[in-house]
Curated annotation (Swiss-Prot):
This is Kunitz-type serine protease inhibitor tigerin-2. Residues 1-24 form the signal peptide. The record marks R41, G42 as: Reactive bond for trypsin. Belongs to the venom Kunitz-type family. Serine protease inhibitor. It comes from Notechis scutatus scutatus. Its main location: secreted. Keywords: Disulfide bond, Protease inhibitor, Secreted, Serine protease inhibitor, Signal. The keyword ATP-binding does not apply. Residues 31-81 form the BPTI/Kunitz inhibitor domain.
């Protein structure tokens, strides 16, 4: 393979590594779920783990259903997901 081809391959692998979410081996699978406000119309401040940003972010939760990536406080979100 030419040096240009190797450089391209290295660049693509680097890009893939940066854009791929953290492996679920580092935290539970529910941490990979998107924020889900659910079908209800409440306005509750909640937190979810954002795998690309690798941090817990605030969102508005409707009050019912949603998914497991939903925490009442940032202190509840960080230990299982951001650790």
């Amino acid at each position: 393979m030419s040096s240009g081809g190797l450089l391209l391959l290295l660049g693509l692998l680097t890009l893939w590594a940066e854009l791929t979410p953290v492996s679920s081996k580092d935290h539970p699978e529910f941490c990979e779920l998107p924020a889900d406000s659910g079908p209800c119309r409440g306005i509750l401040h909640a937190f979810y783990y954002h795998p690309v940003h690798r941090t817990c972010l605030e969102f508005i939760y409707g009050g019912c259903y949603g998914n497991a990536n939903n925490f009442k406080t940032i202190d509840e979100c960080e230990p299982p997901c951001a650790a």
